[in-house]
Amino acid sequence: MSDSQVRKGLNGVISDYTSISKVMPESNSLTYRGYAVEDLVENCSFEEVIYLLWFGELPTTEQLRTFNTTGRSYRSLDAGLISLIHSLPNTCHPMDVLRTAVSYMGTFDPDPFTRDADHIRSIGHNLLAQLPMVVAMDIRRRSGEEIIAPDHNKGIASNFLSMVFGNDDGSVANSADDIRDFERSLILYAEHSFNASTFSARVISSTRSDTYSAITGAIGALKGPLHGGANEFVMHTMLDIDDPNNAADWMGKALDRKERIMGFGHRVYKNGDSRVPSMEKSMRSLAARHRGQKWVHMYESMQEVMEARTGIKPNLDFPAGPAYYMLGFPVDFFTPLFVLARVSGWTAHIVEQFENNALIRPLSAYNGVEEREVVPISERT
């Protein structure tokens, strides 16, 4: 097999069909079920987008009401899971807590190996209801704060912000603008074709393993800094720079050292990430309300240097990092926020994989030593 036949990282390999989303790098655009993501961000709730991803069409008023009622009915945590979360060390990464929680939830699945789409979607409902509770609990237990119960009258974004930050005066959970900007990020992070975590979920599903195992594997993939973990590294970089006036110099020196700077470049988009303008709009909106112009100036300076020196443009993680920071989230929890959104896309892909399944099993090109015989241990040197 020649080197030209080996596609490292499956770069450019088309492994299957999907009707869920379409990434179009040539036109710098992304659609969910045919709708431009920027159109969905401006005109739909996160719940409407989840429904679209799962069923292929935007819901009617009655369909959305039923969908929301079903989803909110799952907002309760098993006592054993609560105890498990509190037993985990505060030093572990929050993604480890999520991964452990999903694995625990899977032990209660009465029919783990079913390929029934409705059952898989019910698991999706369960995860979309309970994982925000897990993340909120984890945030508050690490800071010694009391756990806040979910509100069954609120949407996913609003309820989550309430569970994390409470509802006192000044809380972002009481600001319609803050809730909407956070919800926009959930829509933008919800789905993105065959990315590493989604492909991991599909690989696991292709073996006919259970949905919880597929989601657990996807969380493991998303934890990596070359995938979902990048938004955390973006903010750590900004905090390290600290002063916007130092950003250009910091970037220049980092590029001179040929360091990888998270938040820039994309495996598919070569002319810019189509989701960035919508997320940047929310980032600037949050900065205006939360005295965050420092981060906007730093963002602009870093972007300017990177594009001038390399031509590489930002990806979604670059504006999302400071946006989440201005909302008040601890940096280590940025990637779990990604999970809360992407569970919707993962669920849609697991259903699609089961509908027309083929075991995913690529070939490899061997480049080790040629075949040889075993030498008795007494004769080895």
UniProtKB/Swiss-Prot annotation:
Disulfide bonds: none annotated. Pathway: Carbohydrate metabolism; tricarboxylic acid cycle. It catalyses: propanoyl-CoA + oxaloacetate + H2O = (2S,3S)-2-methylcitrate + CoA + H(+); oxaloacetate + acetyl-CoA + H2O = citrate + CoA + H(+). GO terms for molecular function: 2-methylcitrate synthase activity; citrate (Si)-synthase activity; citrate synthase activity. Its EC number is 2.3.3.5, 2.3.3.16. The active site is at H227, H266, D317. It comes from the Bacteria. Catalyzes the Claisen condensation of propionyl-CoA and oxaloacetate (OAA) to yield 2-methylcitrate (2-MC) and CoA. Also catalyzes the condensation of oxaloacetate with propionyl-CoA but with a lower specificity. The prpD1B1C1 operon seems not to be involved in propionate degradation. This is 2-methylcitrate synthase 1. It comes from Corynebacterium glutamicum (strain ATCC 13032 / DSM 20300 / JCM 1318 / BCRC 11384 / CCUG 27702 / LMG 3730 / NBRC 12168 / NCIMB 10025 / NRRL B-2784 / 534). The lineage of its organism: Bacteria, Bacillati, Actinomycetota, Actinomycetes, Mycobacteriales. The gene is prpC1.
